[in-house]
């Protein structure tokens, strides 16, 4: 087992995916091949982990016994085992059928099961034990997201010497919603085991502070509360993307050529409207489809001049809510294409599959309008990726007010996804915006994201955590 790491990341998943082919970029361990996962979190933390001989603890993604610890690109990886039952109860159940919908404003009713809670607790205990075992004395441990909310307190009980941070990537709900959680006090105490609890938005931090006072009587002042003789800070750290990497990808001649090819395959329409989402009920896919259908029915948009491309990446396919959502979305797509499509020219090109980073960049480059209309979202990095990919090409972003990104991307065409007329109005303003105005808006958003990228996010969080620990950042 890995020992003595000064910096430990604890997340549901490892930052690698197992591969079955001979991918050149993959690494071999114990007869199994791995490649780094795409994603901003991995990109942001890789330099810190590599520099400080850090360790990442997480599940490999495959049920069954865990592989032995191994190393990829200078980062020590400690795989966690999850049985089929644990995947069903801890991950698909408590994490994604209970906590996920509850934290997203009950967009779908959460399901409460005692056996799910018990398994969630046991899995969190194993993650905490693994972190306690590998962390060096006085190490910094950064716990990630809603699947592991009990870990900070469990870890502090075993290793009070550690500096513990926690970051929640999804929204944190108001008191009246959180109080529905049968495990509410246990989850709150779990989070209070951290020295710093980070949220995507200031409202999430405020909800957390108010909840702590309401449920546990914990006094707070500003962003700091006192709990069991310790000070715990709750602050907002809006996550971002690797802006430079997405811009480089979008500037690649092969990606540019692919973008032209995509437009040609779509019939060279005047306006390409794009949606890229996990197939999730929080993303508002149905709402944007209905808005598009009504604009076609009103005659404000027409096929083939305007077409929509909706990428709906498969997600949590064994969870009942997600199965039902797929049926609804595909029924709506069929209705639109039946009513407004033409021979060889569907109104909506619906793609229920995953895409590579380069193909997504090509889609961003090909799209005149990007629609990001979640009913509730912690941040939404797709909106930021679209902005980064546009370079000097203008384009327009239609963005839900309920995405965390709306707090930063104020030059987007903001809308309330529950207000269908408002969504239609925002889409039409985006479609008809003057080219110069589109470039101006996009330029302002790009300047912001260039400065506030994912590396800045990680640095800001770790700086704040180190300050709480009474040390400089080089504590790591």
Tell what function each PLM region has.
Residues 1-476:
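Catalytic cores of carbohydrate-active enzymes across secretory and cytosolic contexts
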